[in-house]
Structure formats: structure tokens, C-alpha cells
């Protein structure tokens, strides 16, 4: 893809979901106000999370089985993968995912080219990651690799809608907004994930996640979901 065209696409996506992204840098909603707003909202949201996640697990159980078989056929190793993330109030959580990489994925980071390493350090992912299996590419493209996180929702680690959980190095990028980011339960999907997940910079991702938190409401969740 032409570099200039790619940049234009990023700008278009962000401008469409946040009319004036630069204005967000000066938008401050106190953590106290966010917590007050969560009081009735969080109980309704938690109830809906448990009900919808339980129904989804039952309905999607045949798909779970098909994916598990496909993973085992293509490569040796476990079907599921647990990834450490930071949840609400800084709690360490283990997210469940269908394994989409080869089993020695961490070791292969050492063989990245300088360009790949630069991209990985900046975005915590690669556009064309050589460690991803064939079935893994399909699972990631369709987000089916994250279906096991329905279990995390039932446990209370995640909500259906919320900022995507991050690792420690990513959290550092939030700087003065770290406390605000950690004040809400992370989600299976969210405002950023639904509106430009694959074509935004990390700075734009953070602004979109904080925009969601500043506008926390059932109305916002419905907007993201649909």
C-alpha cells in the first residue's frame, strides 16, 4: 500500500470516530466524576455481561470445538494460550485466547529484522508476523482467537465493552492518564477496537480509549456494540 494513502486512511478513520481528536488532549474528566457515573451503570453492565457471555458460550460451543480441532491438526501445542494483562485498578489478569502462534513464538522475536523489531516495539504487534500459524491468521482476522475471553467476562476480569487491556510497557504510555485508564474494567471489544483497530497509531488508540472513558454510559456501549 502507498505510504501516503495509508496515512490518509488513518486520518479518515480517526476523524470519523472522533470529530476533533486534538481537542481531546485538553478534555479532562476527573476520576471522581467517572467513578460517580459508574455507580448504577456498573451493576447493570455487570448483569448484562454475565447473561450475554453465558448465552454466547452455550451457542458458540460447536465453534469452539471446530477451532480447537483445527489448531491441533495444524501444529503441536496447547489449544489455549494465557496472556498476562493489567485489569481494573492495576489488577493482574490472565486472558484466555485460542493459540494463534507457533509454540516457540517468544524465542523467534530474536530473529526479527531491525524493521520488524522497530514496528513491534512501537505497536506491540507486527503487520505480517512470521510467528502466526495459518489458522492463527484466520482467527486473528475474524477476532475468533478472543472467543475464550467470554470466560474472563464471566469471571469479572473483563466486560464485553471497554478499553482493551494492556501490558505493563503499554500502560507506561498513558502517563498522567494511567489512573483514569485503570478506573474501568477492560473489555473484550471497545471504542478503539471497533473503530480503527488495524489502522491507527498507538497515540490515536490511547486517545480513543480515553474518549470512551470520558463518555462512559450505556448509550456509549450500545453505540460501540452496534
Residue ranges, per PLM feature:
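C-terminal terminal-structure detector
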Residues: 2-13, 39, 127, 177-226
